[in-house]
Amino acid sequence: MDMEIDDVDNLWTYRSVCMPDYKDAAEIIRPEFDMTKRIFNQRKHLLGMDGHCSTGMTMNEFGTRPMVFTVSKGCYPDLPTDKDKFVGDPQGPKELYMHVYGRFDTYYLDLQNEFQDINNVMNTTHDYNIYDLLKTGARTAMVREAFAGANIHGWLGTKLVYKRPPQSSAGGCRFMVKVYIAGQKTASAYQIKNTLNATSNRFRKKVYNSCVQTYTDFLVAKNAGPIGEMRIKKGVNPGVKKGAKYDYVDVHYRDIEFSNYDTFVLSEIDGVGEDLINLATSILNNHRNNFDILTKTFIKSRLKSLAPIIGGLIGSPNDFTKFKKKMVMYIMTKEFKNCMEYYLTELRSKGIQLYHALGIKSEDVKEEYVRTFCVNMLRYQYLLVMSLKEFWVEKVRGKLYSAVMAKEKEMLTQKIGMQLRTMCFDIETNFVPHSDAEQQVTLIHCVLYDEGAHNCPIEQRTFHYKAEERSMESLKTDLTYDKVVELCKKQVRDGYDLKMKEWLTRTVEQTGMFKSKKILSLFFEKMMTESKIKIHPDSHDYDADNSEPKSVEECLAFCKKRIIEVFDICMEPGKNYFIYNFKTEKEMLLAFLKYVRDSNLTVLTHYNGDSFDLPFVINRCEKLKIDGMKEYTPATFSDGSTETKRRRFQLKLTHRHDILTIKYKKSGKVADSTHKKNAINSYLESKREKLFQADDDDDDDDEDEDDGLLDERQQDSAEDMKKKGPNVYRPMAEARNIFTLQSNFVASRDVMKMVPDQAPNVDDKILKDKTLNSSAFSFLGIRKIDHEAVSYANLCKTWKFGDLNIFVAYCAVDTLLTMKIDQTLKTGMNAVATASNVYLPIRELYGNQALVRTLAIMYSYQWYKNICSPDPSVFKNEDRFWNPEYVWKDDDFKDLKPRAGRTISNVSGVYNSFFSVLFDFNSQYPGVMISENVCVSTLLDKEDADKMSKDDYVEMTIPNVYPKVRHACEPGSEKCGMNLEVVKKKKDYGLKCKWTQEFVMCEHIAKFAKKSVMEGIAGECCKNLLAKRKHYKKLMAEAAKGGNHTEVVIYNQLQLVMKVNANSIFGILLLLDSVTGGAITHEARMQNERGSEYLKKVSGPMAMADTDSTAPIAENLPLDWQPGDDKDDVGPLNRLCRRLFPGRKRPKISEFVHKIDTMYESYGSYLNDGVPEKGIPPAWIKPANLEIEKMFIGLVFIKKKNYYALKMLPGGELATHVAGLACMKSDKTKIKGATQLVLLKMLVEGDYEGYIRYATDLFSLMVVTLRAEEASKSAVKMAVENGQLEGLDELEEKTKRDFGYRDLIPKVYYTSREKVNSIENPKTVADKMEQLRCKRYGIDFSIAATVTDVVRGIKPQVGAPLTAINNTILIREPTEEQKTIEREMDMRWMARSFRQQTREDNRLSDKKEKIKKKNAEVKPLDITDMPDRLKVDQQVHTTPFPTRIRLGVKKLNNMIDYSEKAITKERDSDFVKELFHQPELMADEEELQRATEQVVEMIENFKSFSLHFPLFWYDERYCISNILELEDLDEVWHTLPNDESCVDLWNMYKNLEYEPRYIAVKVGKMGERLQMAFFDSVEESWMEYKCTNCYIFKENVWSLDDKNLAGKIYYMDMQEYEKQTRTTPLIITSPDKKKRYLVNRGSYVRNKNNAFSFKIKNETLMNAMSQTGDVGDKYLTFKPIYGKAGVCIIGSKSAGMCKSTFIRDDGREMPATWPYKRLNNQGIKIPRQKLLKIMNDSLEIRNIHNNHNLEFSFDSKTKNLTIRVETAFDEKRIKFYDESKQEKLEIDIGTNGQTQLGSFYTSVRIENKVEKKPKEVLPEKKQSTLSHFVGMSSAPKFTQDDVVKKKRAPKRAAIDRKSGSGGKKSKITAGKTAGTMF
C-alpha cells in the first residue's frame, strides 16, 4: 500500500546520522521492545525455521544497534536577511534522536570459482554446492566452519546473493554470501579477512563493503544526503519517548520517506512501459546470462501478464523503492522473491509443474533440472533489480529530475547546514616554567555560532576557575564584564593598525595629500572593499573644529575613530555574554561540559585543539574522575608488550553515551631504500639462523636484549616501563601525534588544519606560520593580544595576582579569532557541500578519512550497478622484491609499485633564445578513466576474458621494472661480512657487506572491458563529478551577475567539492590495484608522448614535461640574432615580430601574441580533433583534450617541477611564473626568496653582470651571518646539555660576535617557521630546535609549540639554491677557447700545479663516464622519461654564456664549496676549530656598506612583478623602436598617444642639452591626453618620483590615471638617475590601454658612467693613434663632437675622427651621433704611453686586443674617464702617478663595468684629484699568491708594505672562552683577517 504523508505533522529535519557503539545501544534495550518482532517477520532468512537465531543471538540483541538520526520537529526557518544580528534561541530548535531499525551492518564474502558454475548444482566436492547454499542451514554451517577457531562475534545470519565484485565487475555477477552483523560485540572486517586467509578454501580472501557504513548504504539507496528533511508514514505514530537525559522515537527504516526530490510519475516518459518489458526480456537474451529453458519460459509468461497492467503501475508517483517492489513482485511473484528456504518447497513444486506444462513427464524430471531452475530464479531476480536500478538512474531520474529540483535540494541542504550550531573554545592553563607542578585548566572561553547563517557569534560564555590566592569577593572588582568587553573590542578594532599605517604612508608619499579629504575617501573605500570593515556613515567628515590631519599618525588616529569594528564580537554582558566563576577546577569543567551538551552542537571547533585543548581537558577530567572517567592504563599483552597508543577517549559531547575515537597522524610512504634495508636484513637473518645454529647461546650473551627488536622510541618507552611500571603513560606527549578526534554525534574541527600552508599578505614582513597569531593576521589583519601580562611565562602569575580582565580577554580574543578564521575560510559550508555528495555525516569529514570518503562516492555509483564496494585493506609485500634470493614471477607484477606519469630529464638550462608554450591535458587522469574505460571494475580476470570475444575488451601492455639486489663485495675479501673465514659470530655476519641493485624491465598485458560491455565505475564517477563542477561554476557566474552573494558562496563550495572528489578517484584506484593504476599512468604517458611527437615537428623539441603537460620550444622562431637577420633587428621582440610579420616594422603586442596563440591553438586542435576531411583521426579519445596553459618568453628550468619563467598572458601582459622553488616550501625564508627569485629574474632578463655581483654579495653576507648563528646555537646547546641555564643569552651573543657577526642582515629574513612533529624523538631540524628551546626555558615537552623558529645553515638557505642555478648556467659545454681559459683560472683559483690540474681533470672525466654508464643502465626513470628524440639538446638550445659570466659562476661555486666544507669541519668539532676564512667583501668597509644596503633592499622590497606589465617590458629595445620622437623642444608640453606605447625617458633626456635636469609628467585620466615636459627647475607643489632601487619594487609603480590625482605633476631629477644604478625610468601603457604607469627599471650592478660612453675597435684605435701624433707625445685628447658619429682624437701632428659607437649606461647602443651639446668642447687627455702599454704589453690581452673593443665611459660630474679592455681573466690593479698633470692613473684588469659582449675588462680611470705618491706596487706574481680566490668586483688592494706588515705581525692570540658546557674550554680564534680567502 502506498504511503500517505501528512506534510505538516510528519515532517522532520535531520542534521546528522550515526551508528552508536554497543554501550549506547545497550542503554536503549527494553524488555517490551516491540521492534524485534517486526524485524523478525521481515528477515526470516536470518533465523532458523524454529524462530531462533542459528548463530546463538537472542531476539532482543537482534535490533539493538539502530541508525541514530539527530532530528527536530518541522522544518528549519529560512536564512536570516540580517546576518549581523542573531534573533532566536541560542540552542536552536529542540532536538531529539530518531532510532531507525531494520538495517544491519553487512559484509559480502565472495565464493570460490567452483561455486560459480550453475551447471554443477549436484557437485558435492566441498560438501556443498550452489543449490545447497540457498538453504539457511547450509550457509550458516559453511560460514561457521570458515570462522571456526577464530573469535568472530556478532554475525547473526547469512544470505546467498548474486552481485558483481568490485574487481572485474565487467566479467559479470558472482554468487556471494552476505553476512549480517549485529549485537554488542561485532566482528570487524579485518578479523574476518584474517580468519579467511588462515582457514577457508571456500571463500576468496576479500571482505567486500567493509568500508560502507550502514547509514551510507541506506542514504545511497534512498538518494538522500546526511542533512535534509524526512517524513514518517502516516498511521505509524511512533510517539516521542522520554529517556533519562534525552528524548527519542523508534521507527522502522521502511516507514521513512526523504524529501529527496526522487519521486516521479514514470508515465510522463514516452514509451516507458515498452522499455520496461524489453529491459526484463533482455536479461534472458543476454548470452552471458545463460538461463535454462525453464526459467526463460516462466519469466516470459510473467512478462505477458505484466504488460496489460503496467500502465497502472507507473501512472502514480513512485520513488525507486516502490517502483522496484512493484516490478519485482509482479514478475517474480511473492513465492519466488528472495528464493528463501521458506519458499523452496513451493519453488520446487512450481518448477515441476512447468516441466509438465512443457510436456515432460514427472519421472523424466531430473533433480538437477529443478535445482538449476531454483538457482536461475535467484540469478534473474538480482539481474532484474540491477537493471531496474540502472533504468531508474539513467532513464527516469536522468529525464525527470529537473534543474529546479536540483537547486531546491541544494538550497534546502545549505539552509539547514548554514544554521547548524558550532562552538569554538579555547583554554588557558597554569603553566610555570621549570616547574613540575601539576597543570590545571584555569579558564575556558566558548563562542557559540553557526555555519554561515550569521556573521556574528550567537552567544559567549567564560568559565573561570578562581585561583587560591584570590577570594570570590575580590572577583567582583578584579573581573568585570565591561573591562573584558572593552579590551576585546579594542584588540579587534586596533588590529588593522599595521595595514592602515602601511597603506596610508605609501598613499601620502605618492600624493602629498594631507589637507585633502580625498585621501580619506581613498582609504575608507579600500578598507571597506578589501577588509569589509564597518565604518560610521559620517566617516568622511572631519571633526567639528574642522581640523584636518597633518601627518600619517594624525591621519591614522582620525581613521581609527571612524571604524566601528572589523567584525562584530557581539559581547553584550548579561544578554549573550556571561562569566562564571568557580572555586574548583572540577566545578568549572562540569559546567563547561554541561554547556557543550546542552547546545545541540554539530561541530566543536578549536585551534590545535585535537592535539592539545581537548586531550588536556580530558586528562583533567580523568584525574578528577568526572563522569566516571578513569585514567588510561596501557594494556599489557601476554608476551609482555605494551599498547602505547591510546585508541579512544571516554568523553561525551552530548547527553548520550559517546566516545572520541583517536585518529593518529599517518606515516609517510616507505622509500625503496627502506624496502631494500628490510629485505636484506631478513635475508641475512635467515642465513645466520642456518649457519650459526650451534652458536646461538654464545651470541645471546654478547647481545643487548633490545638490539634489533625495538626502535629508539620504543626502547625509551620500554625503559620507562621498567623504571615506573606498566602504568606509565604520558597523555599530552601522545596527544601531539593525534590528527583528529571523531565523536559519534559531534564533529571536531581543528581550524589550524583548515588554514592553507601559503597564507596571503605577501607584503607582511612578520614570519608566516600556522600559529593563531600569524593566521589571524593573514586572514583578518588582527593579531592576538600582545601584552607582557599574558606572555607565556607570565600567564600563571596574571591568573593568580595580575589583571584578570586582560587574562580573560586574551583567551576570549583567541577564541573569537579562531571563530572568524573558520567563518572566513567557509569551512562549515564546504563541509555541508561535501557531506551531501559523499553520503557521510559532517563529523566523518575531519577524521583523516579520505579513503572512506572516496569509497562512499564510488559506492553511490556501484550501488545501482549491483557492484560491491572493494576491500581497501590491500597488503603488498614490496620488501620481497629486494631480497637477494628473490626470483621473478609474472603474477608478482600486481604488487609492483606503479610508475608515475610522464617526466623529463637532462633538459636543465636557461632558455632565453626561444619562447616556449606549455600544453596541458585537461583533467588527464580522469580523462583516461573515462576515454579508455580503465577501472578496477573493467579489469578482467583471465577466466572472464576467456569467456568474452576479443571485440569486447582492449589489451594494454603496461611496463615496469623490478629490482635485482646482489652482493657487491669482492669474493673472499677480508672486508666482506659474509666471509666465514673472517666472521666468527652470528651477530657480525653480513653487517659490513656492500649491496648494489640493478633493475630489470618487465611488462604485463592487462585486459579492460569496453564501454559496450560495461562503463567503468571510476570513469562514470569522474564524468559526472566534472559535469557537476562545470554546472556549478555556471550557476556561480549567474548568481554573481545577479548579485546573490549567498548563492555565489554556496556554488563555489560545491564546485570545489566536485573538483576534490574527482581528483581523489585515481588515488583510490592506485591503492586498490597496481595494474589499474599503472594502466592509467601508462596511457597518460603515451598521450603525452604522442602529443610531443607532433609538437616537435611543428614547433620544436620539449624543454619541459611533467605528468600531464609538455612544453615545446619555438625552434623556428628564435629570439636571438641569426645569420641573415637585419642588423637593425635589435632585441628579441623585434626579431620575433620580424619573423612573424615579415616587412612590418612594429606590430602591436596584441597582434603577435594573438598570432602565436592562434598558431599553437591550431596545433592543439589537430591533436584533439584531427582533420576529418583528410581522414586524419584525433590523437586520443575524448574527453582527453590538450590545451595551451602558458606561454613563456624566458625560462630557467632547474629540474622537474622546479623552474622560473616569464609568462605571456593572452592580453599581452607579462607575468612571473614560479614552480617548485625552495622559497615556496614550508621552510621558506626571505633569504631563500631573495636568492632564487632575484637571481632567476636576472637570468631571464639577461642581467648576467648583476647576477654575479648580487650572488657574490648575498653569499658573502649570509655565510658570515649564518655561520655565526650556527656557532652560537652550538655553544648554547652544549651549555644546556651540561646543566647551565643562566647567562645563555649573553653566551649566544658573545659567540656570534666572536665568529664575525655584525648585525648586517635582520634575523627575521633568514628564520623560517616550521612545524614541530616528534619533540621527544626529534628527527627534523624543527624538532631539535624546539627541544632545545624547551630545555632552555623549562617548558614541558608535552606543551611544546606546534611551530618554532628555525635558522638553517648556509647550504640549505643560500648555498644549495645558488649552486643549483649556477649549475644550470654551466650546463652547456664551453667552447674550446673557454675550456682553455677556465682551466687556467681553475689552476689559479685553486693554487694547483699543471700536474694537479691534470689529475683533477681526469677525475672529473672519470666521474662523467661513470654517470654516463649509470644512465645507460635500466632504471625506473626509463619508464617515465620522455624519449631522447623529443627532448631539447642542451648543447644547442640552451643559452650560451660569455666566458666572463662562466668564470664568475665557477668562481662562485668554488667559493660556496670551500665555505660549506670548512663550516662542516667546524661543525664536527662543535666550532672549537676555526677553519673558515671570511670573504673579501668583509675587508672593504665601503663595499660592505654598499653590498649590505643593496642586498637588504632586495630582500625587503623585491617583487618579480607587482602587476601584469605589458609584454614589451621584457625587452626595452622594443620600446626604443617606438620612441616618441620630439622634434620641437621649444614647446613645453608634449602629448603622448593613446596606444600601446612605452616611453623611455632616458632616450628623451639624451636628446636635450645637458643642463636641463628635470622631466615632469602630468597626471590625467586615461581618456584624456597625458602630457610630459622638460624644465630647468621644479615647483614646490610637484611630487618627486625618486628611485634608488635596483629592481622594480612595489613603491616604484605610480599610476598616472588616478582620478583623485588628476592635475598633479610628478618630476624626476635625471642627474640623480645618472649617479644611480643602471636604471631606466619608463612610462608604460597597460595592455588593455586603460592605464598608464610611471615605473623604474634597473639592474643590480652600479655604473656611474651614464652619459659619455663610446666603443672603438682596438685595431681602429691603434691606426688612429699612429696617425695623430708623434711617438713622444705625452697625451692624446679625445673629444666627442655633437651630431657626429665618432670621436675626434687630437695629437701634436694632426687630429681626426675615429669611428666609434656610442653606448648607454647599461652597454646598449645609442643612436649613431653624439647627443650632448654642452659636452662638445670638453676633451679628455689620456697618457699615450700608458694607453699603449695597456693595449700591447699586458700578457693577458696580447693575443686578443686586435679583435676586441675598447670601451670609454665618461662621468660628467667627476670628469673621470674609464677605458675598458676586454679580456678573460680575473682582476689585478696597478697604480701609478703622473706628476705632470697631478692625476692618478688607475689601470684595472677586472670587473669595473658592463658590456653586452661579456668578458673581463681592463679599465683605465683618470681622476682629477691630487694625492700623495702611492707605495711600491706589489709584483703580479707575488700578489697572486696571497689568496686562492680573488673577488669579482672590488678585491682589496695590497701594497708591498702591506705584505711585509702582514708577514711580521705576530699571531693573534687565541681566546679561551667558557662554552657553557660545565666549564669545558674551547678555542675560538678572534678577529680573523678578512680578505685572505675570497
Curated annotation (Swiss-Prot):
Disulfide linkages recorded for this protein, renumbered to the chain, are none
**SMART domains for this protein:** POLBc
Compositional bias of kind Acidic residues: 694-709
Q: Which GO terms describe its molecular function?
A: 3'-5'-DNA exonuclease activity; DNA binding; DNA-directed DNA polymerase activity; nucleotide binding
Pfam family name, one: DNA_pol_B_exo1
Give residue spans, biased composition: Low complexity. Answer: 1868-1878
The protein's annotated catalytic reaction(s) are: DNA(n) + a 2'-deoxyribonucleoside 5'-triphosphate = DNA(n+1) + diphosphate
* Cross-referenced SUPFAM superfamilies: DNA/RNA polymerases, Ribonuclease H-like
Q: What is its EC number?
A: 2.7.7.7
Q: Name one GO biological process term.
A: DNA replication proofreading
**InterPro entries with a match to the protein in the record:** DNA-dir_DNA_pol_B (IPR006172), DNA-dir_DNA_pol_B_exonuc (IPR006133), DNA-dir_DNA_pol_B_multi_dom (IPR006134), DNA/RNA_pol_sf (IPR043502), DNA_pol_palm_dom_sf (IPR023211), DNA_pol_type-B (IPR050240), RNaseH-like_sf (IPR012337), RNaseH_sf (IPR036397)
List the keywords (alphabetical).
DNA replication, DNA-binding, DNA-directed DNA polymerase, Nucleotidyltransferase, Transferase, Viral DNA replication
Q: Where is this region: Disordered?
A: 691-727, 1839-1878
Ranges of compositional bias, category Basic and acidic residues: 710-723
Name of the protein in its database record = DNA polymerase
Q: Which organism is it from?
A: Ostreid herpesvirus 1 (isolate France) (OsHV-1)
